[in-house]
């Protein structure tokens, strides 16, 4: 997905009412997607092909790889992006249908509450994704994976498997954790900005 396409799509939508929200949308839409789409494919694209066990047999490699990766990181992070973007996308779709502009979101309490709820839901989804990512992938990719082949009736029951490019994958994991933390911080900051700007609007009245 090109940056021009994202820019045109972004300009056609109702922009978030906060400066932090606009930066967050641009951050999400360009940097995170580019990082995942380009670098994620480069690091994880051929992982299954280069994952090898001892003995190096195709059926054993496939079995152990499926055990090592119940879900591939690319699929997980793509789902994370889509799910986390949903609350904001639904709100902006609703705002576009109702012809709600940026000022209305901050001036009318009902729109402010709905927008804040969408941001809080986004934070909750990011926290859940962060916990799930830790549970699935941990913080480090080790060069050796011990595969349990007892269900295959193979002996020995524990086989050693080589994980390709484990150091690059560890760096990428840390980067994705960092993206999630930055996103959560931006969302929290956006809530405070909304409260501050709403308070200023009420004070001026």
From Swiss-Prot:
Distribution of this protein across tissues and organs: Highly expressed in lens, where it is mainly found in lens fibers and to a lesser extent in lens epithelium. Weakly expressed in retina. Not detected in other tissues tested.
GO terms, biological process: cell communication; cell morphogenesis; lens development in camera-type eye; organ growth
Membrane topology: Multi-pass membrane protein
Phenotype of gene-disrupted mutants: No visible phenotype. Eye morphology appears to be normal with no significant effects on lens transparency and refraction. Expression levels of the connexins Cx46 and Cx50 in lens tissue are slightly reduced.
Principal subcellular localization: membrane
Entry keyword set: Cell membrane, Developmental protein, Disulfide bond, Membrane, Transmembrane, Transmembrane helix, Transport
Disulfide bonds: 53-161, 64-147
Regions of this protein lying in the Extracellular compartment: 44-74, 133-170
InterPro entries: Connexin, Connexin_CCC, Connexin_N, Connexin_N_sf
Pfam families in the record: Connexin (PF00029)
The organism's place on the tree of life at top rank: Eukaryota
Localization per Swiss-Prot or TrEMBL: Cell membrane
Keyword Ligase: no
Any GO CC annotation of this UniProt entry: connexin complex
Cytoplasmic side stretches: 1-22, 96-111, 192-205
TM stretches of this protein: 23-43, 75-95, 112-132, 171-191
Assembly with partners or alone: A connexon is composed of a hexamer of connexins.
Function: Mediates calcium-independent ATP release, suggesting activity as a hemichannel. Does not form functional gap junctions. May play a non-essential role in eye lens development.
Family (UniProt): Belongs to the connexin family. Beta-type (group I) subfamily.
Name listed for the protein in its UniProt record: Gap junction epsilon-1 protein
Native source species: Mus musculus (Mouse)
């Amino acid at each position: 997905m090109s940056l021009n396409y994202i820019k045109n799509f972004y300009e056609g939508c109702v922009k978030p009412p906060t400066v932090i929200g606009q930066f967050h949308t641009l951050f999400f839409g360009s940097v995170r997607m580019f990082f995942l789409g380009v670098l994620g494919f480069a690091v994880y694209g051929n992982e299954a092909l280069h994952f090898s066990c001892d003995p190096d047999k195709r059926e054993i490699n496939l079995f152990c790889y499926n055990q090592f990766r119940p879900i591939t990181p690319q699929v997980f992070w793509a789902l994370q992006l889509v799910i986390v973007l949903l609350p904001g996308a639904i709100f902006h779709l609703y705002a576009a249908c109702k012809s709600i502009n940026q000022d209305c979101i901050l001036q009318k309490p009902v729109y402010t509450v709905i927008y804040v709820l969408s941001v809080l839901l986004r934070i909750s989804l990011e926290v859940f994704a962060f916990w799930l990512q830790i549970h699935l992938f941990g913080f480090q990719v080790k060069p050796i994976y011990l595969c349990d082949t007892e269900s295959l009736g193979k002996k020995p029951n524990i086989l050693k498997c080589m994980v390709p490019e484990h150091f690059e994958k560890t760096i990428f994991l840390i980067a994705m954790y960092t993206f999630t933390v930055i996103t959560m911080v931006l969302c929290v900051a956006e809530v405070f900005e909304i409260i501050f700007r709403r308070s200023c609007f009420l004070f001026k009245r």
